[in-house]
Amino acid sequence: MLYKGDTLYLDWLEDGIAELVFDAPGSVNKLDTATVASLGHALDVLEKQSDLKGLLLRSEKAAFIVGADITEFLSLFLVPEEQLSQWLHFANSVFNRLEDLPVPTISAVNGYALGGGCECVLATDYRLATPDLRIGLPETKLGIMPGFGGSVRLPRLLGADSALEIIAAGKDVGADQALKIGLVDGVVAAEKLRDGALAILRQAMNGDLDWKAKRQPKLEPLKLSKIEAAMSFTIAKGMVAQTAGKHYPAPITAVKTIEAAARLGREEALVLENKSFVPLAHTNEARALVGIFLNDQYVKAKAKKLTKDVETPKHAAVLGAGIMGGGIAYQSAWKGVPVVMKDISDKSLTLGMTEAAKLLNKQLERGKIDGLKLAGVISTIQPTLEYSGFDRVDVVVEAVVENPKVKKAVLAETESKVRPDTVLASNTSTIPISELASVLQRPENFCGMHFFNPVHRMPLVEVIRGEKTSDNTIAKVVAWASKMGKTPIVVNDCPGFFVNRVLFPYFAGFSQLLRDGADFRKVDKVMEKQFGWPMGPAYLLDVVGIDTAHHAQAVMAAGFPQRMQKDYRDAIDALFDANRFGQKNGLGFWRYKDDSKGKPKKEEDAAVDSLLADVSQPKRDFSDEEIIARMMIPMVNEVVRCLEEGIIASPAEADMALVYGLGFPPFHGGAFRWLDTIGSAKYLDMAQQYQHLGPLYEVPAGLRDKARHNEAYYPQVEPARPVGALKTA
């Protein structure tokens, strides 16, 4: 043994070949600060070996290196810029030393090599991979850019276009694509990986492969003519501006950095990467996006713990076909859980099967599946007008019309047709679960399972615990949702549960703005362009359906009369009374016409202004700041109330539900992260300016208390240790 650290070791093989093996405690390898330091110590040893002829890098884990240790990021990002820059310089000196070894080097890459893992293997001369490879640089999704030389080596290895596509989008690619673009040099079966890598290494050692020529382009300026460079970087900047926009500075910073470094050698280019990385790491956007990553890990770990003692449902059923039922059936079947889809109407069953077939055909068109797979999946969806097959299902989700009487009747009837241990769930969006459970003989086997539309795209499933719901029922439904590829978040019962309960105060803020003379177009523009929502409130209402919102608003008002009962006729009422239901009938705040792809495209409709004039004060202008405050305060206050009342268990789960269920702008990190970024005291000052608007603007007592003590909702992270200490960790 030449060297042994906590996360890697170095040993001799034969013929002067050394083997550096990543083998951290736990299930995965991460390129954390300690591992970077340990890699440096291993290189200290290697550089002294006069008989070294070649170096193999490999992993003892199922994945090579899954990336940096994201849990370290928040503390690293709090250190002063100069200190962070010094540590990056140290880390890059380690990878440069690996790249500059006077012998050929190869990485045997299995499974994941992401972020720092990818940057590590880029420093070796050759890369041999297994078919399960996922390799790439996802840093821009975390609000930063590659910091261990990825923005320097990848363009010089692949060419500007392929590298820009991976780095700017934060992409990873599979084995076939990596081989095609030159990111790896070969793909072999897992059992042949080590021997295959050693064979390539010996070819390089024997002179059959020119490893020095392979290494040289990574040390030199990017080989691009002025015209090629202008085209590549202009196109990349245009694409980034279109997709990322101003709220996500990392992708455009990465592109500009690669462009500026294109005519520089490795050392000078790394200096530019360092200078670009450090300011990004100190942005609110980076903290928010890293926070989302950590919250996502927390939510998934919680679901895994919750389901460890239950068996994932093997057969499921959906009550109610149509678009929603068909979407749920597709998602279950697509992920390997056969499903019975029942309705009382042939027409609805046809609609549900058509929806499932349409989604599968899209997968076929994209090359994700072949015709055989399509036929196999669709055959696991059994449409029926009867209860045939219900005796073998483990879980049933009801997705019929949002009417408590209808839902109760359907659920009670279904309960009599299934096994005593079968779990029933309702896809209701607002009706309290305990109310629906009142007609059931086994309420402990019943819970809410709120999917979001479109089911195949929206990651969130709210799992709602009623008064009598058992832990086993919750665990089974969470297991099914996880199997379907969704992110389940468990919430307690109340009207609207969590997501809709906090959405309708936001809509109420919008209605009050329109009542006071705001133009809905301006409000939408501000909330989209300035705050960052994917849709403004008017557009969102049109997509949800004005009739759906009108009904849900009444349910929420009955549930929370003190805050959500309004004493005036609003824009939603006016449009509803005029039969303008949004996209579903082509008329809402906008008029809709299908484009060439069959997607509804919004157009101005002057008739709306005269309709809204009856429920509004004369038009007046509002500042962007006032629009954002009046829209967001009601939502944030309600989010805080949900935490205080135990409807949602933690700030992390609340923020993930908002991001995954409503499209809350990820660069804000969710309501609690946004609150912490603003500061509770500053938020209280802002909210108090609008408390005259009514109870929705009254800040909850717990938040007032936080403001008094200047406390945050997330645990406060301490800055990382000084860079000198990090070096020798």
UniProtKB/Swiss-Prot annotation:
NAD(+) binds at M324, D343, V400, V401, E402, K407, S429, N453. GO terms for molecular function: 3-hydroxybutyryl-CoA epimerase activity; delta(3)-delta(2)-enoyl-CoA isomerase activity; enoyl-CoA hydratase activity; long-chain-3-hydroxyacyl-CoA dehydrogenase activity; NAD+ binding. Residues 311-729 are annotated as: 3-hydroxyacyl-CoA dehydrogenase. It comes from the Bacteria. Substrate binds at D296, N500, Y660. Residues 1-189 are annotated as: Enoyl-CoA hydratase/isomerase. The record marks E119, E139 as: Important for catalytic activity. Keywords: Fatty acid metabolism, Isomerase, Lipid degradation, Lipid metabolism, Lyase, Multifunctional enzyme, NAD, Oxidoreductase. PROSITE patterns: 3HCDH, ENOYL_COA_HYDRATASE. SUPFAM superfamilies: 6-phosphogluconate dehydrogenase C-terminal domain-like, ClpP/crotonase, NAD(P)-binding Rossmann-fold domains. One of its GO terms (cellular component) is fatty acid beta-oxidation multienzyme complex. Pathway: Lipid metabolism; fatty acid beta-oxidation. InterPro entries: 3-OHacyl-CoA_DH_CS, 3-OHacyl-CoA_DH_NAD-bd, 3HC_DH_C, 6-PGluconate_DH-like_C_sf, ClpP/crotonase-like_dom_sf, Enoyl-CoA_hyd/isom_CS, Enoyl-CoA_hydra/iso, FA_oxidation_alpha_subunit. Involved in the aerobic and anaerobic degradation of long-chain fatty acids via beta-oxidation cycle. Catalyzes the formation of 3-oxoacyl-CoA from enoyl-CoA via L-3-hydroxyacyl-CoA. It can also use D-3-hydroxyacyl-CoA and cis-3-enoyl-CoA as substrate. PANTHER family: TRIFUNCTIONAL ENZYME SUBUNIT ALPHA, TRIFUNCTIONAL ENZYME SUBUNIT ALPHA, MITOCHONDRIAL. In the N-terminal section; belongs to the enoyl-CoA hydratase/isomerase family. This is Fatty acid oxidation complex subunit alpha. It comes from Klebsiella pneumoniae subsp. pneumoniae (strain ATCC 700721 / MGH 78578). The lineage of its organism: Bacteria, Pseudomonadati, Pseudomonadota, Gammaproteobacteria, Enterobacterales.
